Amino acid sequence: MVEEAQSQPGPLTRAMVEQIDATLLPTLERHHLRLLAHCLASFQEIASPSTQGAFPSREAQEEWCQGHPLLRDDPQFGVLLLRQFEAAGRQLETLAQTLGITPLELTLEQLINAAVEAAKKKHLKQ
């Protein structure tokens, strides 16, 4: 996954994006799912080779941003990305806790399943 993702401009492969789009969730929910998947894949890349445990520390995230070729020349975007990591990290940690796994063990399939279930519950309440 990492090798395929590195040929892309971001951590998500085309197949991952297609898998998200295939959910047919409403546009806003798919966008949110893509953001969470992007952050999860980034955390997993930063933590590599670790595949379980907590997400990387803020310091490790900052180091990764400073060394990433697409972020090196745009420090302001790096600051925004770190804020996004923080917000997404909280949501992903909550999901991992609900599933009884560590945050780094989360998979795209689990994110998709959670998003689809949340959309179903939202639809039933309306």
Mark where each language-model region is.
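Short Lys/Arg-rich basic patches
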Residues: 2-40, 58-84
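Surface-exposed, Lys/Arg-rich phosphate-binding patches that contact polyanionic backbones
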Residues: 20-52, 86-105
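Short, basic amphipathic alpha-helical segments that act as recognition/interaction helices
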Residues: 50-73, 103-124
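Short, positively charged interaction helices/loops
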Residues: 67-97, 117-126
